[in-house]
């Protein structure tokens, strides 16, 4: 089972694409290692860094930075964000 629930799409999240970063809502029980493994397996791009936070609504959000240039744009295009 994947720890990735769905992409987090806001205006601020779209501006992070220029920094080669994407945001996802993830399972609250997942850790950073599981999130990195799932994203790399699903989308085929290496993750450079991951930051997680719990929102006020009780969901867990992960901000992922990618090693390859333009990886975030490619993934966003694949999942239909652009």
Swiss-Prot record:
One of its GO terms (molecular function) is rRNA binding. InterPro entries: Nucleotide-bd_a/b_plait_sf (IPR012677), Ribosomal_uL23 (IPR019985), Ribosomal_uL23-like (IPR013025), Ribosomal_uL23/eL15/eS24_sf (IPR012678). SUPFAM superfamilies: Ribosomal proteins S24e, L23 and L15e (SSF54189). GO terms for cellular component: ribonucleoprotein complex; ribosome. Keywords: Ribonucleoprotein, Ribosomal protein, RNA-binding, rRNA-binding. GO terms for biological process: translation. Binds to 23S rRNA. One of the proteins that surrounds the polypeptide exit tunnel on the outside of the ribosome. This is Large ribosomal subunit protein uL23. It comes from Methanosarcina mazei (strain ATCC BAA-159 / DSM 3647 / Goe1 / Go1 / JCM 11833 / OCM 88).
């Amino acid at each position: 089972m994947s720890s990735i629930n769905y992409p987090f799409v806001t205006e601020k999240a779209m501006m992070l694409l220029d920094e080669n970063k994407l945001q996802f809502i993830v399972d609250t029980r997942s850790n950073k290692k599981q999130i990195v493994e799932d994203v790399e397996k699903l989308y085929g791009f290496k993750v450079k860094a991951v930051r997680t936070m719990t929102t006020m609504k009780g969901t867990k959000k992960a901000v992922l930075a990618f090693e390859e240039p333009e990886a975030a744009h490619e993934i966003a295009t694949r999942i239909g964000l652009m």
